[in-house]
Amino acid sequence: MKIELCIEDIQRKSKPNSDEVRMIQNVLYKKIKKKEIDGIAESIAVNGKTSMLATYFETGEFSERIHSINFKQQQLIMLDFDNSKVDIEKYGITTYDYVRNHDFIKQNACFMYRTFSDKEAIVDKFRVVFVLNESVKDYLLIGNIYTKLFRLFPS
């Protein structure tokens, strides 16, 4: 099954700085690709390519280019575990191994990977990726999916 998402062509070996992030945000929404999940995992987790999971309808209005009113579809869900100071104080540390061995993750996640920030961090920083059975065209439904996942994994 091919999944549509926005993914850049540039391979990265480190986290982009704030100037690079702004440049990426200005063009990434135009870089729509259709890939199998294995190709997505390799692009993101191995090759460090920046991605945007949703695609959006084209608009001439710059401020609306990645706004919910132009939401087209999304089939991937990604949970970001940063173990920020606030999260640790509120929920404790969420480790990579704990999440990897969680029954829900074993049954439902496609892949997980450590982020660039993990390399210099004392705590684990990683992402877990899920693929939905079909492309979702309702922005609110995507929000509801995230809400339910955040209840399972509040940090």
List the predicted regions and their residue ranges.
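Flexible helix-coil linker/hinge segments at domain or subdomain boundaries
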Residues: 150-155
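Amphipathic alpha-helical interaction segments
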Residues: 145-149
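Signature for HUH/AEP ssDNA processing cores
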Residues: 1-124, 131-144
